[in-house]
Amino acid sequence: MKKIRILGISAFFHDSAVSLIEDGKIVYASQEERFSRIKHDQAFPQKSLRDLLSYNKIELNQIDYVVFFEKPFLKFERLVETYLAFAPRGIKQFLSAMPIWLKEKLFMKKEIIDQLKKIDHNFDEKKLNFSEHHFSHASSAFFPSPFKNAIIFTADGVGEWATTSVAIGDNNKIKIKKEINFPNSLGLLYSAFTYYIGFKVNSGEYKLMGLAPFGKPIYSRLIKDNLIDIKSDGSFRPVSYTHLR
């Protein structure tokens, strides 16, 4: 019986990586930095993808589906709408950033296809799929788990729009039930503290996490009173954004 193979790709953000699923089982996963020796390498994972194919003794055309971890067009929409919401503030940065966004977000599908065709110039473009960011997080948590049914909680900086989500996992299906959207993000607040104490955003958060047990929560009340508004239902919004309106 023919195996169903799914190639997962994460790239162009931080810690680019690939994984291979065969008949529902993860048989390979690696980060590009292991091959490029560039910490948190965000480039398309060419080297790790080639190793994936070599290790599993398969060709790219033997893969049934290729899935990218987010939907770039929706992220591009958020970037544009966010700048327009605060216009004319930041117009110079907006105009200088637009060419980069057009290349990295709006035309990312073409970039991914071009990269895959470097390995196999006959790559079938119809095999390429895009999953919403939080759906990818939920899937990576639920499907490898021992549970047939579960509530799935996801919280990060931001995906396309969602920063926090709750989903229901039921056998082979996942349904997002509730989302909190950008700019309301505990993850971005955490990144702000990461930057404040001198670490790099999207890199040093784990260091802050490692330091946390050695400290005392003497500023927790100050943070709750001045930086974030926590509602009775558990939802939240940063109070510090209001002065930008």
Where are these regions (language model features)?
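Gly/Thr-rich phosphate-binding beta-strand-loop-beta motif of the actin/hexokinase/Hsp70
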Residues: 3-21, 153-168
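Active-site cavity-forming subdomains of large catalytic enzyme subunits
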Residues: 144-188
